[in-house]
Amino acid sequence: MRRWNRLWDVVLGVIVSLLCAFPVSAREKVILDSDMVEGFDDGVAMLALAQSPGIKLIGVTIVAGNTWVSDGVAYALRQLEIAGQNIPVAAGVDRPFRPQRYELFGLERQLFGMGHDAWVGAFGYPKPESWQKVYRERYGKEPQSRPDPRHAVDFIIEEVRKHPGELTIAEIGPCSNLALAVLKAPDIVPLIK
């Protein structure tokens, strides 16, 4: 019986050694483009991507939608800090892509009503002064990290070019950052996975 146990140990050791000798398949590279909120769908998606062993979250780009960009940047930074993740967060487009969409939103609601859902996201409250002010007021402390200095549009362009054919962009907010990136650098379109 001991002989079989010893043989089994050797066989398992050889299998583990062989598995370790081959490189693990590359992790899927992803940029998350989001109108970030605390927790809920966007925050949960970000943390799931950040902590998934099969994913390398290259960065998080923030766009106005459910929240203003300043709010989204503060929320993303704080959630990543709590999770112990050092992932770039880049501020992006803070107005709807369609001309005068923000300015005409009040009139649109008067003419057509609110529909089944009264939630209007960033359109429903004043734009914050800065992400730092949002962070301090919301969390009562100084931020431990800072957003990436690049605009989200430039972040997307540069990262796609750096990882041609390898990068997935997960859009879970308005697509304004990606739309402007494509308009600014149409060469990236075939490079996105």
Predicted regions mapped to residue ranges:
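N-terminal acidic, glycine/proline-rich low-complexity segments
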Residues: V24-K193
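Bacterial N-terminal signal peptides
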Residues: D9-A21
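N-terminal secretory signal peptides that target proteins for export/translocation
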Residues: M1-W8
